Amino acid sequence: MENQTRQYSNEELRARFNPEGSQLWKHQQRMVELLLAFDAICKRHHIRYWLIGGTLIGAARHQGFIPWDDDMDVQMLREDYLKMIEILPRELDETMALQCRQTDENYFFQYAKLRDRRSVLDENNGYDRIFKERGIYIDIFPIDKHPKWLQRLSMQT
């Protein structure tokens, strides 16, 4: 018997995993709003960033989200990250908040989150409830430059 696989279209995947109006669909729409606000501020202040992980795959493969994806990830160089942490809290409207170690004394991650203040996520991870902000979010990861010798070494392994 021959093993056959079926290719699903983006529309079929969205209809199956994330129909318009579903909770996940609404969640994704709010993340897009967060990203658009983030993008506008970053452009205004010449802060560079890029999409990573499933967010990048979704943009390239699905022209949006991976249908079942419930988060969004961006990354930037450390120098841009530090600039962003200074600027973003002053420029966000009242429906959004930057959550990082500088803005939430209970937050312990080494990366920031741009949070929606009009929603509450129950992530069931045991620690989210201690954070000041708990809404829908975008993860913002800093990346550090490495010396050339370390880059060459990592390419050899």
Language-model segment annotations:
Residues E2-Q7:
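Conserved oxyanion/phosphate-binding beta-strand-loop segments in alpha/beta enzyme cores
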Residues L82-E86:
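Short, conserved charged micro-motifs
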Residues D39-M72, Y81:
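Active-site nucleotide-donor binding segment shared across nucleotidyl transfer reactions
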Residues S9-K43, L88-K148:
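Conserved catalytic core of two-metal-ion nucleotidyltransferases
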Residues G53-L56, R78-D80, R118, P142-D144:
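Short, flexible loop/turn elements at secondary-structure junctions
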Residues L150-T157:
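Alpha-helical membrane-targeting segments
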